Amino acid sequence: SGSRMSQYSMSFANSMYANDNLVNSWTVDLNSRFTDNLSNQFLFTYSKLDDSRYTNSSEFPFIDILDGGQKSVDGTADADGTNNYMALGYELFTWNNAVHNTVWNIKDDVTYYLGKHKIIAGLNYEHQMADNAYQRNGTGYYRYKSLDDFLNGGIPEVVCLTYGYGGNNNPAARVQYNKAGIYAQDEWQMTPQFKLTYGLRLDGLFFDNSDLMTNNAILGLDYNGRHIDSGKWPNSSLTVSPRIGFVYDVFGDKTLKFRGGTGFFQGRLPLVFFTNLPTNSGMIQYQAQLNATKAWNPQTGKKEGVDMTPFAGGLVVDKDGKPTAAALRDKLISMGYPENITPEEGSVPSAISAVDRNFKLPQVWKTSFAVDYQIPVSFPMSVSVEGIFNKTLNAATLTDWSVQDAKGFPRFNGADNRPVYPKGSTVGTSAYVLENTSRGYGWSFSAQVNAQPWE
């Protein structure tokens, strides 16, 4: 319907927005030395990251007023009544639009020297919460065909509101997990020239399902014997990460060193990927979109339009005469729109996002070998050569469960031998599931020369 800001239309200042990025971080670090051989480090960290949109507007519906079919003064604008003329109110996509991350971590390490051994053992506990809120039309939306309709209490063409189920004023897709780890490492100076380091780390990952609700309509879908439960995060899992490395000073004077190692290493994943599951489950908030022709009608259960005459006479207001989202929500509920939701009342969305119940955080097997050589010249000069090989153990991948297994499908000839998917190769609603894969590897080789011929 044209731009809200052009030579033929205008937007009031309260319909603008900006972004806020707020970071709060706290750290407590306690180092203790009990004896010459025994020490301890206790570390507590807390971080809160809030990325949100804000506006100078107070709570007020967003209102679009169209041109009513009137040509512009110079006669160049279309006169079909679909062009924007005026826009005002709380910006459509800003109310409760935010991503919040809260992380706190407790770590305690004990270091003990025993002869040729330096032993480090510790415990780690981490809690992380991430939520993603997006409430389009959160303060209400009205669209009028003309300025006269708006000023004289005419019937709006469109009314919209997104509201949380169960009276939740700040609905959000939320994920929470707890991660506990225990680890030990030994640095063993076997000889003056050779040091061996080896260790083991165990990590347990535990998700909190309290923020989720099962959608039975989704659960009932059959993807070749597999089902998706929107009310459950991945199962608790234990990750084992052994590691070993060495440094060999061949002549004992650091002129020639061999170093290398191999081990399993676990990484992280942006939790916003996880929040797609509750966001697309349809169990957090309801998006009401009303018009007289194509809107879903709660009275008939059909997409045939809604009687818009209840909205004649101006914006829906509360008992104090203010056009609030709560007042509009109550109006919609009185017209038959849902107030609450249960697992039995869920419906199948246009597309499903999910996380596999056996999903684990990314993990790789990393192996490296390097040579460092000090060239015997009159100034400092060294050469380092290193090779690194990474093998995927658990990587993140997205799979559409509605697409059947391509095994047995015909393939293109030549270099492009992708499978040819025949008609009927998909089943049901698209379901994009975050899974693990062990496929993939990578390697790198580097050579470096450092020289300081003069100071």
Model-assigned labels for residue ranges:
Residues 3-11, 46-66, 125-145, 208-216, ...:
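Outer-membrane beta-barrel and related beta-rich outer-membrane complex signature
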Residues 1, 42-48, 121-127, 198-204, ...:
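Transmembrane beta-barrel strands of outer-membrane/channel proteins
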Residues 25-27, 105-107, 181-187, 197, ...:
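Membrane-embedded beta-strand positions in outer-membrane beta-barrel channels/transporters
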Residues 236-240, 431-455:
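Outer/extracellular conduits and scaffolds centered on Gram-negative outer-membrane beta-barrels
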Residues 211-241, 245-433:
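Solvent-exposed loop/turn elements at secondary-structure boundaries
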Residues 37-40, 117-119, 194-196, 254-256, ...:
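Repeated loop/turn-to-beta-strand initiation elements of outer-membrane beta-barrel proteins
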